[in-house]
UniProtKB/Swiss-Prot annotation:
Residues 81-84 are annotated as: G3. Residues 174-176 are annotated as: G5. It comes from Euglena longa. It catalyses: GTP + H2O = GDP + phosphate + H(+). This is Elongation factor Tu, plastid. Transmembrane segments: none annotated.
Length: 409
């Protein structure tokens, strides 16, 4: 591998943009890379380079999660531009599960919209610990009082979903006007343009408000596979974020879930096209697997230290069923209901076998808004463990969120 080495000098943070469709998430991502490219080691990325999938071009809506890297004075960031459209919440669930914090982008002309709320709820469910808000399109509002009202509404919405709405930083600005200024003069520095300053101010707030996470480097290694590539002459590469532990080139690992357990050796590690000898929890990496064909491994499997996690199909869980207002079902459901269960990077159909209320009494039907214990049997075995969170989806919408209480089989 003649690639350049990845230098681990600054703390590494995984971050992303979330929010309603067309509120300016991808534009903001581009503005951040352009503004930071002036100050140091960041490569400027244009909107078109981030907004990369062909289906998306047709609709102007971000689908696949795009990974971008940038640096501030204090940190190295990997940024996921998260899909905004309801059909692609699936990617948000798998992309967001990788975030140490997120920038919630809200258009000042609309305020919080239904998808904004769905994304805040999902951020809570998949465990995004910290949010910072960018109130975009500020230039289109000429009334300061209106901006203040929108800010109040945002804080109230965040509080409703158990985020600290009163202390979360809200930065107003215009990502588009910042990009226009940077296109005219790519060398703009702080103090020369108010719109660019607002982007730099946002990054200062992210640096200070989103804490550097303590990585689980001393636990047993586990990576949930997001994607699989075949590289001619080199073999099969699985990509994903290391959830816990660390891994070195040459170590033996197991591939678990969806198919029979397979053992393999790691022959290479890469991050942002640079090679690594060792990768640690929090890193988004490509892992080269010895002797594994592309058809033997797929998204949703995990790569783990041998003997540390098993595939299972049946578990008991505590679940919250979303109300109609939260974007959930309008009607109750019964035993035998078969929705999709989203766990880590995988979605598997599961059959709900039985329900119990919190006091242990058996329940015949479940209403939107109920908190319930339920036993689930999946159609395929996946690597799961006690304490793991999951989302329940059906027909393009999130209908519930849960946590595994114990494994049955």
């Amino acid at each position: 591998m003649s690639r350049q080495k990845f230098e681990r000098i600054k703390p590494h943070i995984n971050i992303g943009t979330i929010g309603h469709v067309d509120h300016g998430k991808t534009t903001l991502t581009a503005a951040i890379t352009m503004a930071l490219s002036v100050t140091g080691n960041t490569k400027s990325k244009k909107y078109e380079e981030i907004d990369s999938s062909p289906e998306e071009k047709a609709r102007g809506i971000t689908i696949n999660t795009a990974h971008v890297e940038y640096e501030t004075k204090n940190r190295h960031y990997a940024h996921v531009d998260c899909p905004g459209h309801a059909d692609y919440i699936k990617n948000m669930i798998t992309g967001a599960a990788q975030m140490d914090g997120a920038i919630l982008v809200i258009s000042a002309t609309d305020g919080p919209m239904p998808q904004t709320k769905e994304h805040i709820l999902l951020a809570k469910q998949v465990g995004v610990p910290n949010l910072v808000v960018f109130l975009n399109k500020e230039d289109q509002i000429d009334d300061n009082e209106l901006l203040e009202l929108i800010e109040l509404e945002i804080r109230e919405t965040l509080n409703n979903y158990e985020f600290p709405g009163d202390e979360i930083p809200i930065i107003t600005g215009s990502a588009l006007l910042a990009i226009e200024a940077l296109n005219k003069n790519p060398k703009i520095i702080k103090g020369e343009n108010k719109w660019v300053d607002k982007i730099l101010d946002l990054m200062d707030k992210i640096d200070s408000y989103i804490p550097t996470p303590i990585r689980d480097t001393d636990k047993d290694f586990l990576l949930a596979i997001e994607d699989v590539l075949s590289i001619t002459g080199r073999g099969t590469v699985a990509t994903g974020r290391i959830e816990r532990g660390k891994i070195k080139v040459g170590e033996t690992v197991e591939l678990i879930g969806l198919k029979n357990i397979k053992s393999t050796t790691i022959t290479g590690l890469e991050m942002f096209q640079k090679s690594l000898d060792e990768a640690i929890a929090g890193d988004n990496v490509g892992v080269l697997l010895r002797g594994i064909q592309k058809n033997e491994v797929e998204r949703g499997m995990v790569i783990a230290k041998p003997g540390t996690i098993q595939p299972h199909i049946k578990f008991n869980s505590q679940v919250y069923i979303l109300t109609k207002e939260e974007g959930g079902r309008h009607t109750p459901f019964f035993e035998g209901y078969k929705p999709q269960f989203y766990v880590r990077t995988t979605d598997v159909t599961g059959k709900i076998e039985s329900f119990k209320s919190d006091d242990g009494t058996t329940v015949q039907m479940v209403m939107p808004g109920d908190k319930i214990k339920m036993i689930v049997e999946l159609v395929q075995p996946i690597a799961i463990e006690k304490g793991m969170r999951f989302a329940i989806r059906e027909g393009g919408k999130t209908v519930g969120a849960g946590v595994i209480i114990n494994i049955i089989d």
